[in-house]
Amino acid sequence: SKGNINLNHQGKNLIQFVNSRLNQQPLGYIETYVDFSKPVKTVNAYLQPDCQHCLATFKFSHKEQQSAVNFSGKNFPMTQITALLNVPNTLTGNADFNIQLALTNSGLTKGEFSFDAQNGELLGLNLLDMAAQYLPINYNSDLTASRNMNTPYERLESHLLFENHLLTVDKIRLKTTALLGEGSGAIDLDNVQCDVNLTLRSTNEKYKKLVLPIRFFDSCYSPQYKVNIDQNFRHQLKELIKEKLK
């Protein structure tokens, strides 16, 4: 990457990078304004990767031992977001996002994360293959043409909260060609353990009442799962069969 630094004797500086990279991911053009002339030190950065209509802003402020970060963007590649956050890449696609962090002595104390991602894949998890064993979904050749361990999705919304080393998954909403999903849970960041409950249903209106509950647990890199075939699911299935036999 190439850079340009414009220093100001009053403590206000401009730093520019072209073709920048972080954690092996291209970040494109970055323009950063640094102001250390006041009691509250600030850094404002604008990121523009080599993609259409995508932009992100990074705002950092620091006073004494307290710091605050706001990182937000529109239509930003998820692979670049995970690279910037230095977290495992489990998702592709582009997202509108907003991240707010509070730090004390450079240690993260609280955080809030909102993502609205579109047209990507959940990596390492094939929900379609899993749900097709229990739900009457449109499991045709188009959907299974590239049978692998990923889940293509049309839209994925999530809202997460961080406090005391625990990341609470407040909301997950998922839409794929054949499935709708909703869920919540928690992630222990110390040992990267996940515990998430997700309900799946078919996008077909005929079967929307049939809801499949699944619990994902253990390592976030390769989660185990348990399908909860409870009395409620069996009752829904019986009612569906009765309707089909009429």
Language-model-detected regions and their locations in the chain:
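Surface-exposed, gly/pro-biased binding rims or lids
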Residues: N148, L198-I229
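Short, structured coil/loop segments at alpha-helix boundaries
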Residues: G124-L125, N140-L143, N204-Y207, K242-K246
